[in-house]
Structures are given as structure tokens and as C-alpha cells.
């Protein structure tokens, strides 16, 4: 089983399946079990269990096996969790986050912004000229927005992720 006390793993799973899904993962019985058994043992609603299992399955953290009842012909779905690939998934997420942060950093560095003093909007220079430097929401005069602090924060975040 995966270490759910690890902040990174816990945060990643929480972002995937939410609090109820995380509760289900924590209390999930070992081996192959049906979704009804999971709901009964984890005290999580059946809809939530199914939603969580589908999300985990899409991310390759849950494995499903179908079994046909020889008498009734009904299918039974047996589920088990498999977090053996979580490190690889976390690396993919890290690369995606790093790529997005670099894109945002480049955008912030290469553009000039104007902002409404009331906080209504933040516009690019071209957009501000189109509105004649007036806020399209409230009509206030737009003021130059110095985003250097935001750029510094983004740069530190990119550096931290790159070195980790």
C-alpha cells in the first residue's frame, strides 16, 4: 500500500478524488472486493465509491476484473488498488506543472499590464489601449501594474521544482 502520510502523495490523491475518495482509499480492504463491499467497509456512499474507483482506474491506480455468475449470468466487478506506478505519475504531474509555470513566467515577463485600482480587471497593454485605459467594468482609470514581485515568485517556484 502507498504511504498516505506522505504530504505529496496525499495531496495528489486528494486533488484526484477529494476527501471522501481519500477516506475510501485509507479504509479500503485488501484484495479484490466489490464496490458494495467497499462502501460497506469504508462507510463512504456507493456513488462516491464508484466515482472514486473510476477516477483511480483512469489514472491506473485501480484494477478492475469482471466475473460472470454462472447461475444468474450477472457480472460482478472486483476492484483492487495498485499504487505501484504512483512515483511515475507524480513525475508526470511535476513536469506538467513545471511546463505550465514556465509558460506563465514567460507570459508575465514578456507583457505589460494595466489594472483597475478597484481590482476589477488586469489587462494587457494592447487591451488597455483598446479601452482607452478605462476599466471596462467600472470606468476607473487603469494604472500600470508592476508584476515584478509575481515574476520573482514564479521564478523561485520554477527553480525549486527544477532542482527537486
From Swiss-Prot:
Residues 5-87 form the HTH TFE/IIEalpha-type domain. Keywords: DNA-binding, Transcription, Transcription regulation. The keyword Kinase does not apply. The winged helix domain is involved in binding to DNA in the preinitiation complex. The lineage of its organism: Archaea, Methanobacteriati, Methanobacteriota, Stenosarchaea group, Methanomicrobia. SUPFAM superfamilies: Winged helix' DNA-binding domain (SSF46785). This is Transcription factor E. It comes from Methanosarcina barkeri (strain Fusaro / DSM 804). Monomer. Interaction with RNA polymerase subunits RpoF and RpoE is necessary for Tfe stimulatory transcription activity. Able to interact with Tbp and RNA polymerase in the absence of DNA promoter. Interacts both with the preinitiation and elongation complexes. Signal peptide: none annotated. Belongs to the TFE family. It holds the Pfam family TFIIE_alpha. GO terms for molecular function: DNA binding. GO terms for biological process: regulation of DNA-templated transcription; transcription initiation at RNA polymerase II promoter. Gene3D superfamilies: Winged helix-like DNA-binding domain superfamily/Winged helix DNA-binding domain. The keyword Transcription applies. Transcription factor that plays a role in the activation of archaeal genes transcribed by RNA polymerase. Facilitates transcription initiation by enhancing TATA-box recognition by TATA-box-binding protein (Tbp), and transcription factor B (Tfb) and RNA polymerase recruitment. Not absolutely required for transcription in vitro, but particularly important in cases where Tbp or Tfb function is not optimal. It dynamically alters the nucleic acid-binding properties of RNA polymerases by stabilizing the initiation complex and destabilizing elongation complexes.
Amino acid at each position: 500500500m502507498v504511504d498516505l502520510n506522505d504530504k505529496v502523495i496525499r495531496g495528489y490523491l486528494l486533488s484526484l478524488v477529494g476527501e471522501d475518495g481519500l477516506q475510501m482509499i485509507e479504509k479500503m480492504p485488501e484484495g479484490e472486493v466489490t464496490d458494495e463491499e467497499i462502501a460497506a467497509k469504508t462507510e463512504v456512499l456507493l456513488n462516491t465509491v464508484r466515482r472514486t474507483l473510476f477516477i483511480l482506474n483512469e489514472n491506473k491506480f485501480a484494477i478492475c476484473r469482471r466475473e460472470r455468475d454462472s447461475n444468474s449470468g450477472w457480472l460482478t466487478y472486483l476492484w483492487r488498488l495498485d499504487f505501484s506506478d504512483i512515483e511515475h505519475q507524480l513525475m508526470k504531474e511535476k513536469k506538467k506543472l513545471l511546463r505550465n509555470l514556465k509558460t506563465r513566467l514567460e507570459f508575465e515577463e514578456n507583457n505589460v499590464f494595466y489594472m483597475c485600482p478597484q481590482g476589477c480587471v488586469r489587462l494587457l497593454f494592447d487591451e488597455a489601449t483598446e479601452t482607452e485605459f478605462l476599466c471596462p467594468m467600472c470606468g476607473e482609470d487603469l494604472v500600470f501594474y508592476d508584476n515584478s514581485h509575481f515574476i520573482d515568485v514564479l521564478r523561485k517556484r520554477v527553480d525549486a521544482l527544477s532542482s527537486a
